[in-house]
UniProtKB/Swiss-Prot annotation:
Belongs to the protein-tyrosine phosphatase family. Atypical dual-specificity phosphatase Siw14-like subfamily. It comes from Arabidopsis thaliana. Pfam families: Y_phosphatase2. It comes from the Eukaryota. The record marks R117 as: Transition state stabilizer. This is Inositol diphosphatase DSP5. The active site is at C111 (phosphocysteine intermediate). Its EC number is 3.6.1.52. Highly expressed in flowers. Expressed at low levels in roots, leaves, stems and siliques. It catalyses: 5-diphospho-1D-myo-inositol 1,2,3,4,6-pentakisphosphate + H2O = 1D-myo-inositol hexakisphosphate + phosphate + H(+); 1,5-bis(diphospho)-1D-myo-inositol 2,3,4,6-tetrakisphosphate + H2O = 1-diphospho-1D-myo-inositol 2,3,4,5,6-pentakisphosphate + phosphate + 2 H(+); 3,5-bis(diphospho)-1D-myo-inositol 1,2,4,6-tetrakisphosphate + H2O = 3-diphospho-1D-myo-inositol 1,2,4,5,6-pentakisphosphate + phosphate + 2 H(+); 6-diphospho-1D-myo-inositol pentakisphosphate + H2O = 1D-myo-inositol hexakisphosphate + phosphate + H(+). It is an enzyme of class 3 (hydrolase). Keywords: Hydrolase.
Amino acid sequence: MGLIVDDDNDGEVLIPPPNFSMVEDEIYRSGFPELENFGFLSTLNLRSIIYLCPEPYPEDNLKSLASNNIKLFQFGIEGKTDPPTPMPKDTVLSALRVLVDVRNHPILIHCKRGKHRTGCLVGCLRKVQNWCLSSVLEEYQKCAGLKWRQRDLRFIEDFDVLRLKQCLYSIIYQYNGYGLKRRKLLYQEENVVQEQQKPQATKG
């Protein structure tokens, strides 16, 4: 079930979602949160959740998100399939764009168990952060446990982070070193300088 935390303020027992952990400051990952986990999640002051499954989000969970002003971003990626299907690169890229936008932080990433789909997205984030590939793959395997998938490792290895830079039309996320604490968000409009057209005088 995960670690049980006692809230010193009112004695409430707080239960994290399965496989919960911190990725970076204000970025978290986990398995699918149940209603019993939302007390714990409220302590994170989340702004957003990235949900990586195709199934509709439970109505009770949606109500809890609404009451806490948490935005839900759903990217429907199939889990275990027979035969196995490749991870959709464009979908992961879209999720990554949401993830690197600090306006969505604090943010939680989750799929069903918080291992494979979540692990692939976090692995791609690490590549954006310029982690060495061996460390990226090691983190994926550690979080996936005995059920790590070779095809996920190949996906992370082959994922082209240059595509992210090409697709960030209005936001450039600039990393200084490996950490996110010294991050800097630069807002850039597609047309940085837009001259206002003034009415032209007409000759009578």
